C-alpha cells in the first residue's frame, strides 16, 4: 500500500480510511438442531420484506446476499448479517453502518425482532 502512495506514511493512509460503526460478533444461543431453520426463516422474511417494499431499520432493502446465511444491506449502506455458527450451538449476528452508531443500533434491533420470532433463540453472549 505504501509503495502505491509514495508521498504518504501509514498514519496518513489510516486517517484516509472511511469511518464506520461496527458491532462485535454477537452470538445468541440457538440449538444445533434448529439454528439452520432459524436462518432459513430469516432469509425468507428478508426476501418477503424486499419483494413487498417493506423497510428494515427504516430503510429500503437494496441487497440480499444469501451465501452461508444472509447479509441485508439498506439504502444508506448499513448492513446486518445472520448466519449459523459452524461449530457452536449459536447464531452469529454482525451489524455495521457507514452513517452512525444509531443506524447500526437500528439494524441490530430490526434483526433481533425477527430472530425473537423463534423461542429457540436465546440470550446473546454480548450486545451493543
Predicted regions and their residues:
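Phosphate-binding and adjacent anionic-ligand microenvironments
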Residues: 1-86, 90-94, 99-128
